[in-house]
Amino acid sequence: NLFFYINFVMGKINSIYAASMSIINNDLTLDVTKTIQHAEMIIDQGCHGAAIFGSTGQAQLISITEKIKLFNQLSTSKYKDKYIIGTGLNSLSETINLMSVARSLNFKKFLIMPPAFYKYEDDNVINFYTKIIEAHPECEIVLYNFEKLCGYKFSVECVQELVKRFPEQIVGVKDSSYNLFENLEIDNFSILPGSESKLLKGLELGCSGIITATCNVTSALARKVYDDFFDKKEQSANQKLCNVRNAFEKYNLISGLHAYYSKTNGIYKNVLPPLSILNS
């Protein structure tokens, strides 16, 4: 039945998630309050939740001190249970320490990409996540598969081995390299493509939803496609959803999203160097 399908085929995180944006002050510090308000807004608009400090949130460019400040305030958000925390760090030690802060505030779900810059193989990646889980056995990790950013692409076999070793901790994958969502089948494991254009096809294949940058804009449309799929309604919004995604993909997604929002609210005009906002 549908209940069995959702809970045992689709996985633990069955949702439309936005990779939420970070709001930057004129002096290039993080505006913690407005960053949280933005995440709450896109949840109000239709997302089930938001990933904080993913690549869209400029995670690799924001200081650890500012991240900790945001975690403390985020722990009082009305949507506290709807957030996945991105670490956005190369250092294993700093990743573990940042997770310690988040865990002390009762955050449990984390989006973690393997380190960038260095060449390594599946066994090395398994060791990296093993060290994290040994330090935080109570955490739930969504793997971040994005070869374009970190230089490593998860294989089906690597994900299967991680889930086999850590079925309670490795709960899903954000697939932005798109080599997994059509080929990976693991019970009680969430596969979340990184694009709205993969949402409907992914759901048809048993995927759990999406985590995407452009859900900062498409939250209502993406939620409608998701809900209509499970309500067995005709898909009236999917083409428009894909069109919006395709329009943003012509540009750097972070620059495009900040340019889009800054047209109506000047707080979005700042991004951290070396990024820049789109011109007119």
Predicted regions and their residues:
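Short, Lys/Arg-enriched N-terminal segments with co-localized hydrophobic residues
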Residues: 1-9
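Active-site beta->alpha loop and helix N-cap motifs at the rims of alpha/beta catalytic domains
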Residues: 11-151, 159
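Generic alpha-helical structural context detector
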Residues: 18, 223, 227, 255-262
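Electropositive phosphate-/nucleotide-binding environments in soluble metabolic enzymes
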Residues: 29-36, 64, 68, 92, ...
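Catalytic alpha/beta core domains of metabolic enzymes, predominantly
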Residues: 146-248
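Conserved short secondary-structure transition element at the edge of the structured enzyme core
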Residues: 203-204, 240-276
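Short alpha-helical "patches" and their helix-cap loops
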Residues: 221-229, 269-280
